[in-house]
Amino acid sequence: MSSSRAMQRLCGLMRKAVQDYEMIAPGDKVMVGVSGGKDSVALTIGLAELRKYIGFDFTVQAVTLDPQFGGRPMDYTVLQELFAQYDIPYEIRRTEIGPVVFDCRKEKNPCALCAKLRRGALHTAAQELGCNKVALGHHLDDAVETFYMNLWREGRIGCFSPVTYLSRRDLTLIRPMLLATEQA
């Protein structure tokens, strides 16, 4: 499948999810946390494309939280140039997540702490930028994996929701790629 056809398919699935689960409303300001991986980049571009034909206006704001692993900032020039082509405002926020996790706390299993710190920084960035929604790049494969991990590790049936309201932050998390598989 060509990349343009793949993007059309992804946008169609995103549109269905957005409409079926009422993820985005007119005037919403949606922030996407961009790691630089394929899921977050596809989500950001997909949302920008979706603005063209969804039938109402909403804003997309891309943000990268640079964890500064190794104590050094990363170069995000490629993402800056890509998002400029789609008229997507893009901000890079340097954080101390890497040094805190590895130098201060010296975690043996740093993933949980790193994820918690990133979530907090992401929610703070959304609030500071005046965003009312945070779009996450979880897709159908992630939902299936989460379902089975909960079943096997915790003995319970459960998964994340397409839309989650965080009352303490007054933010809504949305997962527009939920109907798409990783191959979609």
Segments from the language model and where they lie:
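Short, flexible loop segments at boundaries between secondary-structure elements
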Residues: 159-183
